[in-house]
Amino acid sequence: GTFKDRLILEGDPHSILEGMAIAGYAVGADKGFIYVRGEYVLSIERLGKAIEQAKALGLLGSNIFGSGFSFDVEIRKGAGAYVCGEETGLIESIEGKRGEPRIKPPYPGTEGLYGKPTVVNNVETIANIPPILLNGPDWFRQFGTERCPGTKVFTLTGDINNKGLIEVPMGITLRRVIYEIGGGIPGGREFKMAQTGGTSGGCLPKELLDVPMDYFTLPEHGSALGSGALLIMDDSHCIVDIAECFMRFFEHESCGKCTPCREGTARLHEIVAKIARGEGKPGDLELLDELGSVMQVSSLCGLGQAAPVPIKTMLKYFRDEFEAHINDRLCPTGTCGI
């Protein structure tokens, strides 16, 4: 659950257009594409209107402000496939092809959209360009940490009182986000798990509530900042049930182009579903971990490489719940009905 990009698209589309024009000037590009899910009707509408306004004011188009630099922006609608979050899958989709990743190298910076060198960035990154140029790097560095300066937009969802979007300094801890900004867990229940970085992010226990959230520290614990999603779960949830939900998602979203991801996501889901039904057997957890490791090193793109991350971190931090399902045929929360 992340919608911070949609907020920027709908709330401040001109920041994206300005950032793209600056980026285009920096790299010598004269055309930019904004790839948006087709379901985001309001985002597309407002972005289209912003492009018209920018062209009318001479901020986009030919010979911008008599500078000799020309830059135009075009919106391309996607069908919502998760794999198109991978840069080469996104490029394939923009070209009108099926959304599947390309073999790399060549990388997009060398041979990308229509065979030309291409820069691919998230809208949050692009929207940060104008204020940094306007205020300077020292202004940006006053937020966050020395290694990870600036701010990050997070989407707070799940079992938390104050759901929504927050912008916080890099390096803030999970504890501060959940209890000071998010207002804590509803109904007086206990915090159990936080998934950072979206569906393919790691799942962290209460022992890691004081870990700084930045691009360096989270990977040390098996997770990442990723898309800025923060899914909070209380102690009423079964870890195995959550794992089954995640693995079902990845099985469905795999494009099927490479064998490790196509077969790996299906097998991960199959094994976790059996454990949830009380049909798990000794060795299943080791098999899950081994299969996940193989996928991480052999899958063609980031989807297959990241799909095992939730299950691997769950096995690391919540292994006792999996063992209860296998050894005792018992779901500690009563969720799985075994």
Go through the PLM ranges and name each one.
Residues 19-23, 171-186:
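Short amphipathic, charge-patterned alpha-helical segments
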Residues 12-26:
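Histidine-anchored nucleotide/phosphate-binding helix
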Residues 1-2, 39-44, 81-84, 90, ...:
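Flexible loop/turn segments at secondary-structure boundaries
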Residues 41, 158, 191-211:
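Short acidic beta-strand-loop surface patches of small beta-rich interaction domains
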Residues 93-105, 207-224:
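Active-site loop ensemble at the mouth of alpha/beta enzyme cores that anchors a bound cofactor
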Residues 5-9, 30-32, 36, 40, ...:
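Ferredoxin-type iron-sulfur electron-transfer modules in oxidoreductases and energy-metabolism complexes
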Residues 44-170, 182:
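Hydrophobic alpha-helical positions that pack around
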Residues 32, 183-198:
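Short loop-to-beta-strand transition segments
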